[in-house]
């Protein structure tokens, strides 16, 4: 595959991570560059790791991916989005919410990288070398997630709790999109 093809693949796979980074960063106060870096490392790392996992597993995990992964992603994103909405409505009135603990980051990273797992499986079926696409996918996702986190914080700073609610709705919407795509392909 060409560099351009791998870059466009990375860009497509990074869109969910970009949106989730943007949504997540609206709730972090005080926000520091290390928070954006933490999001970028988790999302970029998982987007790079999951195709390798899919490539190594090949057809052994294809049944699981096609049958359950979309439901898992939907459940995780809906849970986290609902939690964000709840915290925006009933949380700390000072707005000091830190949802960047490692368990939440892990759930978000897994939920947004399930498509990358499926890409890795398709690479195995097509006998495609994995190293170059994985590096490009991980780097593109890292940059997109970092930019999404910084942008989300700047928007969130102006709109406070309304953006937290919108961010939660975006996460639920992404989960719904993943599930709808799965159900339409059955």
Curated annotation (Swiss-Prot):
Bilayer-crossing regions: 1-21, 41-61, 71-91, 105-125, 130-150, 165-185
Localisation: Cell membrane
GO cellular component: plasma membrane
Membrane topology designation: Multi-pass membrane protein
GO molecular function: manganese ion transmembrane transporter activity
Keyword vocabulary terms for this entry: Cell membrane, Ion transport, Manganese, Membrane, Transmembrane, Transmembrane helix, Transport
Major location (coarse): membrane
Function (record text): Probably functions as a manganese efflux pump.
HAMAP family, sorted: MntP_pump
Entry similarity comment: Belongs to the MntP (TC 9.B.29) family.
Name of this chain's protein: Putative manganese efflux pump MntP
The organism's taxonomic lineage, starting at the top: Archaea, Methanobacteriati, Methanobacteriota, Stenosarchaea group, Methanomicrobia
């Amino acid at each position: 595959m060409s560099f351009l093809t791998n870059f466009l693949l990375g860009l497509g796979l990074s869109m969910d991570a970009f949106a989730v980074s943007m949504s997540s960063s609206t709730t972090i106060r005080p926000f520091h560059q290390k928070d954006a870096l933490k999001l970028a490392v988790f999302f970029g790392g998982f987007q790079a790791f999951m195709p390798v996992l899919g490539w190594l597993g090949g057809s052994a995990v294809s049944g699981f991916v096609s049958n359950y992964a979309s439901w898992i992603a939907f459940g995780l994103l809906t849970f986290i989005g609902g939690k964000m909405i709840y915290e925006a409505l009933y949380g700390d009135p000072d707005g000091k919410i830190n949802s960047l603990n490692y368990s939440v980051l892990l759930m978000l990273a897994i939920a947004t990288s399930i498509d990358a797992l499926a890409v890795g499986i398709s690479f195995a079926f097509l006998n495609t070398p994995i190293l170059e696409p994985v590096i490009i996918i991980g780097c593109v996702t890292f940059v997109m997630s970092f930019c999404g986190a910084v942008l989300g914080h700047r928007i969130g700073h102006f709109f406070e709790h309304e953006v937290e609610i919108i961010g939660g709705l975006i996460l639920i919407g992404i989960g719904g999109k993943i599930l709808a795509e799965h159900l339409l392909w059955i």
